[in-house]
Amino acid sequence: MNRLYLKGCGTALVTPFTDDYKVDYKAYAASVDRQVESGVHFLVPLATTGETPTLSAREKTELLRITRERVGGMPLLAGCGTNSLDGTLANMELLEPFGPDAWLVVVPYYNKPTQEGQYRYFRAVAERSTLPIVIYNVPGRTGANMEASTAIRLAEDCPNIIGIKEASGRYDQVSELIRRAPEGFSVLSGDDDMTLALMATGGQGVISVASNVAPAEVSAMCDALLKDDLKTARTLHHRLFPLFKGCFAESNPVPVKAAMARLGLMTGKVRLPLSEATASTVELMNKIIDDLWKSA
């Protein structure tokens, strides 16, 4: 297995829906093209931002097929994690023929596994996977945090666990991960507003929600950080910060879809149990978008 090294800006792609809540594959393909043309470093279909729990098997495979077809050799990190080993392995079997380069596997949700349970689960997934794996730690959604020591243990024991998307919001934990991570293990921010801090202290990149809206700008910030150009990175961070915060004014991806609608790229429709952005969120995102382009 070739060692994949993820760095820079990876966009967690939204899934556009039509007014009658069907997947808008045309808008999705255009969105993927926009990402590629804007210089993002890798793409992440079928994750949280893509409303993947609401998608059918056919929709998932078609979205991944379209993505692979349009990105050439750009790395694709596809979401496949569930809260059971069998469910995650079944997703891998379903999706692998459609060209992912690696899997994004979330810490199992609802079950609230212990650190030992998390370790055994990810080790079992890694042993059965033919592709590299990136752990996704997002305790605000799963109810269980993966501690730095568990992630390091997995990185050392499982050669095909190549990184972690860290969305715990705990900089002390992420800093420990960065300090102890083995060479070639990517620590990626799962929170746009923490990207500057993480990359400035040795993290490799971000899996971004905001880059759906501003792919060139978020990619440029990551490029600057990879070159240790903190002055440029700080300027971009401060320009983008209202967008970073606004994207979480309501549950992701509700606000980012409102922003994409403002740009005319897709509708703001989301599938139940999510509901469309409130009037105040639409107003907020409209202002953020207008101000962002004014400040260019």
Model-derived regions, located:
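Active-site beta->alpha loop and helix N-cap motifs at the rims of alpha/beta catalytic domains
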Residues: 2-143, 153
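Short, well-ordered beta-to-alpha junction loops that form the rim of enzyme active sites
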Residues: 138, 167, 259
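Structured C-terminal cap/extension of enzyme domains
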Residues: 23, 36, 197-296
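Gly/Ser/Thr-rich helix-start
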Residues: 9, 48-51, 80-82, 164, ...
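Glycine-rich phosphate-binding "P-loop"
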Residues: 137-138, 160-161, 271-272
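Catalytic alpha/beta core domains of metabolic enzymes, predominantly
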Residues: 127-128, 141-248
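A general structural signal for well-ordered alpha-helical segments in protein cores
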Residues: 28, 60, 64, 88, ...
